[in-house]
UniProtKB/Swiss-Prot annotation:
It catalyses: a 5-methoxy-2-methyl-3-(all-trans-polyprenyl)benzene-1,4-diol + AH2 + O2 = a 3-demethylubiquinol + A + H2O. Fe cation 2 binds at residues 88, 140, 172, 175. Catalyzes the hydroxylation of 2-nonaprenyl-3-methyl-6-methoxy-1,4-benzoquinol during ubiquinone biosynthesis. This is 3-demethoxyubiquinol 3-hydroxylase. Its EC number is 1.14.99.60. Keywords: Cell membrane, Iron, Membrane, Metal-binding, Monooxygenase, Oxidoreductase, Ubiquinone biosynthesis. Belongs to the COQ7 family. Residues 23-42 are annotated as: Disordered. Disulfide bonds: none annotated. GO terms for cellular component: plasma membrane. It holds the Pfam family COQ7. It is a peripheral membrane protein. It comes from Variovorax paradoxus (strain S110). Residues 23-36 have a biased composition (Low complexity).
């Protein structure tokens, strides 16, 4: 009975911590190569909006990894997914810290984003471990591309946010490579397209609220 409840309790704990607790990083936030410069009000608002989008992405990452771990058939894979979730928690803390520093708020829709991502993670996990890993690899590839686009949009003066995004991009690429090495299956093109569409909706809405 206890072993049956363990994934449920883990998932519930992860949801509460992600949505309502102050995130704590195991690594210090990346230090910028140069001191931050002065930003105009419009630049600060845009930086805050972009980091809100990135924070939502990390909320979703927690949901995805937790859900996939809950239904993973291989105990080794389950442990790997939970480890990745813990590593992504650094990103959650860093982006929240930058939101606070920029005077911006997290998305008010975070519970909705979390629930949707958790559902997707359950579906992906139920498809079997190779496809679940394929979902991880494709998600991380798309996130990496998304972060690269943000480096082109963040104000040059916001070196603190840029340092965070650059390190996140490195970490996401590593997670994608680890999923592939673990036996990820290539997802069908329609699945990738749907993932990009869902991501576009999320980023567009989260940029505003």
């Amino acid at each position: 009975m206890t072993s049956t409840l363990d994934p449920v309790l883990t998932a519930a704990d992860a949801a509460l911590r992600t949505l309502f607790a102050r995130p704590h990083a195991t690594r210090a936030a990346p230090a910028p190569a140069q001191a931050p410069g002065e930003m105009t009000d419009s630049e600060r608002r845009e930086a805050g909006a972009l980091m809100r989008v990135n924070h939502v992405g990390e909320v979703c990452a927690q949901a995805l990894y937790t859900a996939q771990a809950a239904v993973a058939r291989d105990p080794v894979l389950r442990a790997r997914l939970l480890e990745a979730s813990h590593e992504e928690a650094d990103h959650l803390a860093w982006t929240r810290q930058r939101l606070d520093e920029l005077g911006a708020r997290p998305s008010v829709l975070n519970p909705l984003w979390y629930a949707g991502a958790f559902g997707l993670g359950l579906v992906a996990g139920r498809l079997g471990d190779p496809l679940s890993l394929g979902f991880v690899a494709e998600t991380e590839r798309q996130v990496e591309a998304h972060l690269e686009s943000h480096l082109g949009r963040l104000p040059a003066a916001d070196s603190a946010s840029r340092a965070v995004v650059e390190q996140m991009k490195i970490d996401e690429a590593q997670h994608a490579a680890q999923a592939i090495d673990a036996g990820a299956a290539e997802l069908p093109a329609p699945a990738k397209a749907l993932m990009r569409l869902a991501s576009r909706v999320m980023t567009t809405v989260a940029h505003r609220i």
